[in-house]
């Protein structure tokens, strides 16, 4: 499942829970599914953030390479 698919399903789950028109057992199942989807999306975002890099420049402003972006 892609990040986008997981987010879309998570939005659907949240919408169902917010409406409050589902039985308790179904609400619990939806909550558990939502928690799993949230974790999956957070993990995917963390992996993506770790891949982000800043371009380093020399004293003349020329690119010399990349380094990880701190604070992400």
From Swiss-Prot:
GO molecular function: exodeoxyribonuclease VII activity
Coiled-coil annotated spans: none
SUPFAM superfamilies: XseB-like (SSF116842)
TM segment ranges: none
Gene Ontology BP, a term: DNA catabolic process
InterPro entries: Exonuc_VII_S, Exonuc_VII_ssu_sf
Keyword Protein biosynthesis among record annotations: no
Major localisation: cytoplasm
Keywords: Cytoplasm, Exonuclease, Hydrolase, Nuclease
Catalytic activity: Exonucleolytic cleavage in either 5'- to 3'- or 3'- to 5'-direction to yield nucleoside 5'-phosphates
Location within or outside the cell: Cytoplasm
GO CC annotations, alphabetized: cytosol; exodeoxyribonuclease VII complex
The EC number(s) this enzyme carries: 3.1.11.6
Main function: Bidirectionally degrades single-stranded DNA into large acid-insoluble oligonucleotides, which are then degraded further into small acid-soluble oligonucleotides.
Quaternary context: Heterooligomer composed of large and small subunits.
Family classification: Belongs to the XseB family.
Protein name: Exodeoxyribonuclease 7 small subunit
Organism whose genome encodes this protein: Ruegeria pomeroyi (strain ATCC 700808 / DSM 15171 / DSS-3)
